[in-house]
Amino acid sequence: MQPTFVLVHGAFANSFSFAPLQAELGLLGHRSVAVDLPGHGFQATFTRAYQSPQDPEGLATAPGSIKGITLADNVAHLIGILERAKRNGPVILVGHSRGGITITAAANARPDLIDRIVYVSAWCPVRLDVNDYYAEPEMAGVDPAAFASALVGNPAELGLLRVNFRTAKPDSLAAFKEAFFADGTDEQFLTFLNTFQPDENLDVGGSADRAQPATWGRVPKTYVRLVDDAGLPLALQDRLIREGNELTPDNPYDVRTLAGSHLKWLVDPAPAARALGELATLPAPSARA
């Protein structure tokens, strides 16, 4: 039976970023659904202060619809989509970047709805909370200035993270490009940057949201490594794979590797679409034993 790929975006992103990938999947004969987590997509806040000419003071204080949204809200929303998708047959759940936190928590809660879980350079916390991984050696080369230089307002007062992706500051744009799309042209980079929304929620979960062997560990899983990713470095991706395998040695990751940066696979999606398409007929680990 044909599976449905359910695609979950990362921070500051939305379903729009999956459009090229969905086109490739569709042309290969695969069905897919791109999710907008709560407060994303057409639920996002784009204030007039964000338009040109920008109003920096207004942008720093304007309320955002994503305020108060939690990881639990994201998971509940995703589970509702998984329940609908599951009525049509097998479900392959795919998360990118911060989306990995949500798909991990969803697999902890409802493994019965997921036939395979796929991380594309995505977070899957096992031994540490996500924020704590940033202090680990694998993340030493990640420069927080990429976001800090364009951060707007006080997150504690706003109740959200706000980044001015429409900044014209050369240093900020250079930091964004280096972190996420160093192998793209300037035109591709700026186009992708304009699909981002300025606001993201604050909740990245805690120890209870780490991968749980009794539930998450039952789901066949794949990790797609992005070799040139500077935002989620390959060393950290490999550590997450290793920790996941140690947690569930009888259900190890099926590991795939793609060349390119954090965003390249979404702009040039043919290799990723082929890799994902191969998973549609991949048997579960128990069936391969």
Predicted regions located by residue number:
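Flexible "cap/lid" loop of the alpha/beta hydrolase fold
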Residues: N108, I114, V118-V163, V204
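Conserved serine/cysteine hydrolase catalytic core
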Residues: N194-G260, W265
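Serine-hydrolase catalytic-loop signature spanning alpha/beta hydrolases and amidase-signature enzymes
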Residues: F12-P20, S32
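Active-site glycine-rich loops that stabilize anionic/oxyanionic intermediates
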Residues: G10-A13, H96-R98, W123
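Alpha/beta-hydrolase fold nucleophile elbow
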Residues: N74, K86-S97
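Short glycine-enriched nucleophile-adjacent loop
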Residues: G100-P111
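Catalytic active-site module of serine/aspartate enzymes centered on a nucleophile-bearing elbow/loop
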Residues: T248-A289
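Conserved alpha/beta-hydrolase
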Residues: L25-T61
